[in-house]
């Protein structure tokens, strides 16, 4: 909320390199258990249809339309930078030696004119999520809505406080859950 943003993407979004030190600072402010919610914006669009990156690490091929190719190249390079952030965050967390669960998910796909037919899973509004931990949680695959993910993680951690979390944890598998 009060980060000193020094670096932005060519489209004006804050880059993720600012996040690791700020997350570590947040974790250092208390001696006890922490809950930190961080939102990355580096990969957000609109994605430029003109060449924007001087020396991209990843070159997109196979897209005939030059504007679309430029937009995809910009997007995949920003996601590549976001992947680096994830690796840096995990390294920093591992060095702390504290029991930790990290949840990574996207709340939407990129605004690149995608249609359901373009996607392997055919679901335009689904995104993947990854849970990383150093406490031995059992891997559990499945589909879950973004608004349910924290209730699911807290349930797996045996945390059952909070009205909304309790509702999602207790009612998710019932007939009238979202009625």
Segments from the language model and where they lie:
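Solvent-exposed soluble domains appended to multi-pass membrane proteins
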Residues: 1-179
């Amino acid at each position: 909320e009060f980060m000193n943003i020094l670096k932005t993407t060519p489209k004006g979004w804050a880059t993720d390199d600012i996040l690791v030190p700020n997350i570590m600072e947040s974790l250092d402010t208390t001696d006890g258990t922490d809950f930190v919610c961080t939102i990355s914006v580096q990969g957000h669009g609109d994605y430029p249809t003109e060449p924007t990156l001087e020396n991209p690490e990843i070159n997109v091929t196979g897209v005939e339309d030059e504007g679309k190719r430029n937009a995809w190249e910009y997007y995949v390079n920003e996601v590549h930078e976001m992947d680096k952030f994830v690796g840096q965050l995990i390294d920093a967390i591992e060095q702390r030696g504290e029991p930790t669960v990290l949840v990574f998910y996207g709340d939407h796909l990129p605004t690149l004119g995608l249609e359901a037919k373009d996607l392997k899973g055919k679901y335009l509004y689904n995104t993947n999520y990854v849970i990383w931990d150093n406490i031995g949680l059992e891997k559990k695959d499945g589909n879950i809505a973004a608004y349910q993910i924290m209730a699911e993680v807290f349930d797996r951690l045996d945390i059952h406080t909070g009205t909304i979390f309790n509702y999602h944890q207790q009612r998710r598998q019932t007939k009238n859950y979202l009625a």
